[in-house]
A protein has these predicted regions:
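Domain-scale signature associated with acetyltransferase and cell-envelope carbohydrate enzymes
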Residues: 167-210
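Catalytic core of tubulin tyrosine ligase-like
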Residues: 5-178, 182
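Short acidic donor-binding/metal-coordinating loop in glycosyltransferase active sites
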Residues: 1
């Protein structure tokens, strides 16, 4: 609900899971921005694939790096999951664990919030297909009122991505501006051209300042 770049019913994602014979679930994954980014990470738990929520991950693992300096656990969970029907049927009789997180609730800081997450189904199912995506194309979370991961940064990411769609399609755009293409006009940049741009500008294509 807080990801402005999410691809609804992504055909590549659906097709990837459908083409696997033994996998019954899949989840999109991005490289973490840094060790402090508040996203869960993909890891094996008791030899089964799963997600460790950021609030449950010990700091020593959060900061752990490889010899080249990259994060050891950098597969970030962006909460875009997909299940085959047989997987959902298996979960009908299962119960998911509770997680705790400190949040600001009704103006009260450091309140405890108890949550259940769908990703805890992965160890129960036993198989999960990680599907890597590019952050700039698919992950623009809105978690803060301002600063990083805010409405402003999400707006800018949409504008830059759609501007790139138009540029690749040959549209005569203003590179100093940002653009938003209606999903009724193009799902992921297909079907665009300079002719379409000129016809739809101000209608299904909006131009705005950074």
């Amino acid at each position: 609900v807080d990801k402005a770049l999410v691809k609804v019913c992504d055909p590549a994602f659906v097709g990837a899971l459908a083409s696997t014979g033994n996998m019954i679930s899949a989840s999109k994954v991005v490289h973490k921005r840094n060790a402090a980014e508040k996203v869960g990470i993909f890891a094996f738990q008791n030899k089964k694939p799963g997600v460790v929520e950021y609030s449950d991950l010990p700091e020593k693992y959060r900061e752990m790096t490889n010899p080249d300096g990259s994060l050891t656990f950098d597969g970030g969970n962006i909460a875009i999951h997909l299940f085959k029907m047989e997987g959902l049927r298996k979960l009908q009789s299962s119960s998911l664990p509770w997680h705790t997180a400190r949040k600001t609730v009704c103006g009260i800081e450091n309140s405890w919030k108890f949550e259940q997450f769908l990703f805890d189904a992965f160890p129960l199912l036993g198989t999960m297909l990680p599907f890597g995506v590019v952050r700039e194309d698919e992950f623009s979370p809105v978690k803060n009122a301002e600063g990083h991961d805010s409405p402003k940064t999400a707006r800018e990411m949409i504008g830059k991505l759609h501007r790139e769609w138009l540029r690749k399609a040959g549209a005569k755009i203003n590179q100093a501006k940002l653009y938003e293409v209606s999903p009724t006009l193009s799902y992921a940049g297909e079907g665009l051209s300079n002719r379409v741009f000129e016809r739809e500008l101000g209608k299904n294509i909006l131009e705005f300042d950074p």
